[in-house]
Amino acid sequence: MGAEAVRVLVVDDSPVDRRVVELLLRAHCGGGGGAAAGEAAPFHVTAVDSGKKAMELLGRRRGDRDHLTPSSPAAAAAANDQAIDIVLTDYCMPEMTGYDLLKAIKALGSPNPIPVVVMSSENEPQRISRCLTAGAEDFILKPLKMNDVQRLRKCSGATRPKSAVAGDDDRCCNTAKKAAAAAAATPEQQQQQQRSSHLAGLAMVMNASSFEVSHYFQLIFKLILLAYAVLCLSQLLHRWSNGSSLLSLWCA
């Protein structure tokens, strides 16, 4: 029997980054890494472009669950469908940053707090430490890779057992060690890492959206052919009109 879907709320103001994350998570459906081989839970992705919209969505779903009758099996199923298992948010966003969203979610005071994972294209140790201290489950560098999806799956409240909670401290310690190692890196090394991340992100966009890109190229090519055909037709009409004028003068 397949595992239950992991409901992920993706928060990013960049439409390209949102699309990349959606494609990556959906491509990982049914992959390995679950409790048993071939039984990894698929991802159900909901994407918004701001922290404000994320809080509105979480508040609305929380309010809907509060109005349901707990004793009703149908109500329990509906509440389960509305739940969000994990929030994956970008750090740099206008108005409400990923750090602000993290604090706002933690301030909801839910008995079962939603795990929050922060992502960023900038490898800044102070930023990583700040988010982990505020309660982030993990901090992932963009662009996301397949092993990052595995980390996201382990952080989600829907798939990790209670016995795995004890391992959170070890995970956070490992992330903190990575942050310390990044702090020890020279500015040139950090710039090289950022350039590599940007190039990898571009490659991921091209690979994940190959169908969309090829479709756009075909459309552009057809438009160019159409424009060329119209140009040739106009030239022929122009020459024909000039020829008709000369013929009329010669006949006169």
From Swiss-Prot:
Q: What induces or represses this gene?
A: By cytokinin in roots and shoots.
Q: Which residues carry this modification: 4-aspartylphosphate?
A: D90
Q: Which SUPFAM superfamilies match?
A: CheY-like (SSF52172)
Localization recorded for this chain is: Cytoplasm, Cytosol; Nucleus
Which InterPro entries does the annotation name?
A: ARR-like (IPR045279), CheY-like_superfamily (IPR011006), Sig_transdc_resp-reg_receiver (IPR001789)
Q: Which PROSITE patterns match?
A: RESPONSE_REGULATORY
Q: Which GO terms describe its cellular component?
A: cytosol; nucleus
Q: Name one GO biological process term.
A: cytokinin-activated signaling pathway
> Which stretches make up the Response regulatory domain?
7-157
Domain of life where this protein originates = Eukaryota
Post-translational modification here is noted as:
Two-component system major event consists of a His-to-Asp phosphorelay between a sensor histidine kinase (HK) and a response regulator (RR). In plants, the His-to-Asp phosphorelay involves an additional intermediate named Histidine-containing phosphotransfer protein (HPt). This multistep phosphorelay consists of a His-Asp-His-Asp sequential transfer of a phosphate group between first a His and an Asp of the HK protein, followed by the transfer to a conserved His of the HPt protein and finally the transfer to an Asp in the receiver domain of the RR protein.
Pfam families assigned to the protein according to its UniProt record, in alphabetical order: Response_reg
User: Chief subcellular site?
Assistant: cytoplasm
Q: Which UniProt keywords apply?
A: Cytokinin signaling pathway, Cytoplasm, Nucleus, Phosphoprotein, Transcription, Transcription regulation, Two-component regulatory system
Q: Per its database record, what is this protein's job?
A: Functions as a response regulator involved in His-to-Asp phosphorelay signal transduction system. Phosphorylation of the Asp residue in the receiver domain activates the ability of the protein to promote the transcription of target genes. Type-A response regulators seem to act as negative regulators of the cytokinin signaling.
Q: Hey, which family's this protein in? A: Belongs to the ARR family. Type-A subfamily.
Give the protein's recorded name. Two-component response regulator ORR2
Q: Which organism is it from?
A: Oryza sativa subsp. japonica (Rice)
Q: What is the lineage of its organism?
A: Eukaryota, Viridiplantae, Streptophyta, Embryophyta, Tracheophyta
Gene encoding it? RR2
